[in-house]
Each structure stands twice: as structure tokens, then as C-alpha cells.
Regions:
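N-terminal "domain-start" segment that seeds a small globular fold
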Residues: 1-19, 37-39
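Thiol/selenol-based redox catalytic cores and closely related redox-interacting motifs
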Residues: 86-166
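Conserved helix-turn-beta segment immediately C-terminal to the redox Cys motif
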Residues: 24-25, 33-34, 38-62, 81-85
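Extracytoplasmic electron-transfer domains, predominantly the class I c-type cytochrome c fold
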Residues: 74-82
Length: 179
């Protein structure tokens, strides 16, 4: 199975086939405009502007599962992302990325990667403690743990890497490797 077999909901509620992105390197992520990690939008936009002409796309899926609930519509989330952070990459309808109601795309992404921790910074230890409160066995499963978890998909449609929100330093190297 490849990413191209999935359909997702666009901002307008219509189905979007990921086969529309055949041949592109994709960075698929979950986000929340009110997240502590929302500052990453600026760096992600910089990467998008730098590599988009080389067959690189970022696909952004807003998500309310990690305590950063935004009560507005999908369109309001999009406008906030554009106004606050200058986002120009594609955004889709709000989704669940883990649990019973997770969309098939994120189930597949999670099942085909593994969680490798949050790193070793002081913030990483705090995040681990917070995530453990929700899932005592969080280290033993590949579920998405936080907003701004990113999955890198190669040009053939297969997921090749996963980046936790604390892992921005490796991200550009990963993108370059698959372009």
C-alpha cells in the first residue's frame, strides 16, 4: 500500500485523492494553531518555499486531540494559519490522528513508522512526563503523541521517516535526502 491510495477531506469537505501528489516528496503532519509548537509553522513555510519547486509538498491536517482545541471552523483555522504564520502549503479538514476515530491515512503512517522518543533536551523530558500521563505505555506504540508530528513520504509513496515535534533539526536533511 502507498500513500497514493488514500483520500482525505479538503477544507471544502470534498474528497482529495493523494494520488494528486504522485511523484512528490510529501511531509504529512498534524497541527494545531493554538499548540506550543505552532511556532514551527514559520520554519515549515521556509522549507516549503525553498523546496516546493523541486517536487516537495507539505500536507497539513489540523487536529484537536492534544489539548489544543480550537472552536472555529476549518476555514477559520486556515485563515489563522495564514494570518499568523504566512502558511501557503495545503491544509485539509480537521482530523483525528490516533485512536478509534483516526483517519486511515494517519493509522497507516503510524503503523509504518516507530516512535523514537522526544530527544534529550530538558523540554523533551517534560514532554515525556506529560505524554506518560495520557498513555503509560507511550514508548511501546507508534501512535502520534503530540501536535506537529511529521511523516516524510518518498516519491514512490512510501513513508520513510517520522519526526517528532522536538526533532526539527533533522527535518531538512531528511527532505533533501529524498528530493
Amino acid at each position: 500500500m502507498s500513500v497514493y491510495e488514500f483520500k482525505v477531506k479538503g477544507l471544502d469537505g470534498n474528497d482529495v485523492s493523494l494520488s494528486d501528489y504522485t511523484g512528490d516528496v510529501l511531509l504529512i503532519m498534524n497541527s494545531a494553531v493554538e499548540s506550543d509548537f505552532a511556532y514551527q509553522y514559520k520554519e515549515l513555510e521556509r522549507l516549503y518555499e525553498k523546496y516546493n519547486g523541486n517536487g516537495f509538498e507539505i500536507l497539513d491536517f489540523p487536529c484537536d486531540q492534544f489539548g489544543n482545541v480550537f472552536r472555529g471552523t476549518d476555514e477559520e483555522i486556515h485563515h489563522l494559519s495564514v494570518d499568523r504564520y504566512g502558511v501557503t502549503f495545503p491544509q485539509f479538514s480537521r482530523v483525528d490522528v490516533k485512536g478509534k476515530y483516526a483517519i486511515p491515512l494517519f493509522k497507516w503512517l503510524s503503523q509504518n513508522t516507530y516512535f523514537d522518543g522526544f530527544g534529550r533536551s530538558p523540554r523533551s523530558f517534560l514532554l515525556s512526563r506529560e505524554v506518560r500521563k495520557q498513555d503509560r505505555n507511550y514508548r511501546d506504540n507508534s501512535d502520534v503523541k503530540l501536535d506537529f508530528t511529521k511523516f516524510l513520504v518518498d516519491r514512490t509513496g512510501y513513508v520513510v521517516d517520522r519526526f517528532e515535534p522536538t526533532d526539527m533539526k533533522r527535518l531538512e536533511e531528511g527532505i533533501q535526502r529524498y528530493l
